[in-house]
Curated annotation (Swiss-Prot):
GO terms (BP aspect): isoleucine biosynthetic process; L-valine biosynthetic process
Presence of the UniProt keyword Chloroplast in the record: no
Organism: Saccharopolyspora erythraea (strain ATCC 11635 / DSM 40517 / JCM 4748 / NBRC 13426 / NCIMB 8594 / NRRL 2338)
EC number(s) reported in the record: 1.1.1.86
This protein's name: Ketol-acid reductoisomerase (NADP(+))
Keyword field: Amino-acid biosynthesis, Branched-chain amino acid biosynthesis, Magnesium, Metal-binding, NADP, Oxidoreductase
Pfam families in the record: KARI_C, KARI_N
Keyword Manganese: no
Function: Involved in the biosynthesis of branched-chain amino acids (BCAA). Catalyzes an alkyl-migration followed by a ketol-acid reduction of (S)-2-acetolactate (S2AL) to yield (R)-2,3-dihydroxy-isovalerate. In the isomerase reaction, S2AL is rearranged via a Mg-dependent methyl migration to produce 3-hydroxy-3-methyl-2-ketobutyrate (HMKB). In the reductase reaction, this 2-ketoacid undergoes a metal-dependent reduction by NADPH to yield (R)-2,3-dihydroxy-isovalerate.
Binding site for Mg(2+) 1: D192, E196
Record-listed substrate binding positions: S253
Length: 332
């Protein structure tokens, strides 16, 4: 099936301009969505708890700030951009009691819908708009007259117009300037979780730590090991990001490329691929979601233990020392 990609010419910005939008949350994505929608002519309000530290920031940026319940009652399109683990409670306490027939419930990630943690009534639209970039980039690109590609999906089309509404919303945050790709809640959620677990976060972190351990255990200086398996990773990832794997290989030495082509498959071998398939299966059948929800509800004991173990790894101490020598790695 051919991928469907939409652009500004395919979107009707007037649709989102005619809605009352509530953005629940004002973190990385929340601020980018709210400010860009406002600048696109939409009627936007923010939903935050009374004690939220983000309330002052949102008000300083000229946005109306209400409680999540008040914002939901006032709006006819509610975008939930709170953390995954908090969405179910926010929905039950503040949104569900204020949902009206014909409203639209939007998400920036499909987790809670895909795994049935939130079950909207049948008379509301349920859709997703997910920019493929962090909030600060979404906002900066919008202000510069550009955009970050977005995914859109429709889970429930009560109005018969949910896709057009999602596309209009995506255009309102600049996504249609770059391209809006149609997907499903299932595809977005499962590929996102798999990517995080097997490659981007879990896979990369474990690969780097294990490579560091192999070098140090073989008698090499930890500082040298850090440079070779962690620090220089950014150089390679940047090359991949700019030109794909082929572009990265074109830019490195022949020696490095030969080692890549002949040794890489020995590290990421058939056994690793089978482990990846098992991880994907746990995402698909809900095993991971059930485990994570139970872990969160129990106070995150295993999460905290594993986090502490990771923070205590030798690579963290070595890295902190070496990064202090490199001013360009320091965040302002």
């Amino acid at each position: 099936m051919a991928t469907e990609i939409f652009y500004d010419a395919d979107a009707d910005l007037g649709i989102i301009q005619g809605r009352k939008v509530a953005v629940i949350g004002y973190g990385s994505q929340g601020h980018a969505h709210a400010l860009s929608l406002r600048d696109s002519g939409a009627d936007v309000r923010i939903g935050l708890p009374e004690g939220s530290k983000s309330r002052a920031k949102a008000e300083e940026e000229g946005l109306r700030v209400l409680t999540p319940a008040e914002a939901s009652a006032e709006a006819d399109l509610i975008m939930i951009l709170a953390p995954d683990t908090k969405q179910r409670q926010i929905y039950a306490d503040d949104i569900a009691p204020n949902l009206k027939s014909g409203d639209a419930l939007f998400f920036g990630h499909g987790f809670n819908i895909r795994y049935g943690l939130i079950k909207p009534p049948s008379d509301v639209d349920v859709a997703m708009v997910a920019p493929k970039g962090p909030g600060h980039l979404v906002r900066r690109q919008f202000v510069d007259g550009k955009g970050v590609p977005c995914l859109i999906a429709v889970e429930q089309d009560a109005s018969g117009n949910a896709q057009a509404l999602a596309l209009s919303y995506a255009a309102g945050i600049g996504g249609a300037r770059a391209g809006v790709i149609k997907t499903t809640f299932t595809e977005e959620t499962e590929t996102d979780l798999f990517g995080e677990q097997a490659v981007l976060c879990g896979g990369a972190s474990a690969l780097v730590q294990t490579g560091f351990e192999v070098l140090v255990e073989a008698g090499y200086q930890p500082e040298i090991a850090y440079f070779e398996v962690l620090h220089e990773l950014k150089l390679i990832v940047d090359l991949m990001w700019e030109g794909g794997i082929a572009g990265q290989r074109y830019s490195i030495s022949d020696t490095a490329e030969y080692g890549d082509l002949t040794r890489g498959p020995r590290v990421i071998d058939a056994h690793v691929k089978e482990s990846m398939r098992k991880i994907l299966a746990e995402v698909q059948d809900g095993t991971f979601a059930k485990e994570w929800v139970a872990e969160d509800e129990a106070g995150r004991p295993n999460f905290n233990k594993l986090q502490d173990q990771g923070n205590a790894h030798q690579i963290e101490e070595v890295g902190k020392k070496l990064r202090s020598l490199m001013s360009w790695t320091q965040r302002p």
